[in-house]
Amino acid sequence: MSSTDLLEPTAAVTTVKTYLRPIDGTGLAAFATKGQANPASRGTNKVHTVMEGQYRSLSYVGNHAPVVVDEPLHLFGEDTAPAPGEIVLSGLGGCIAVGVTAVATWRGVKLSKLEVFMEGDIGNPAAWGAGGALEKAPPEMGFQAIRVKVLVEGDASREVLDEIVQHANFYSPVANSMRNPIPFEISTL
């Protein structure tokens, strides 16, 4: 499998004749108006993660089923679930897809297909700080590059669809969290 395999559809691409289920355009407009009226407003996402053993953990988010996280066999996990970095990329893909859907709705474009393909080059030379290359600085760890490709179809030209994708990327909260340094604190209970 080449490094580009994950960025391309693996099945034959067929044009869908129906449109994706739309979001509430009126609700989106009200949410946008609220943001214009109070640009400093913030929400708080909360997650509670519990280790089961080895590297397998369960993250509880609201009333949803827990998100299971594990590491692959070559990193001493059991490979029963996506790795933490894959979960991060999943969040990025979900946020970009939400943004594309919102911007398309705002612009009056109906989407018939939307898929986001991501891959990221991640480094962990310090072995989580457990005796690896401890001389490496944090900027040399974690994602060093992320590549995203968006497959989008709808009732607009390629140019308009590309503008929608670029606009959604520019304003994506998760993409901006990854691109921009954010205050981060950690403490024990």
Model-assigned labels for residue ranges:
Residues 1-90, 100-189:
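Extended beta-strand/beta-hairpin segments
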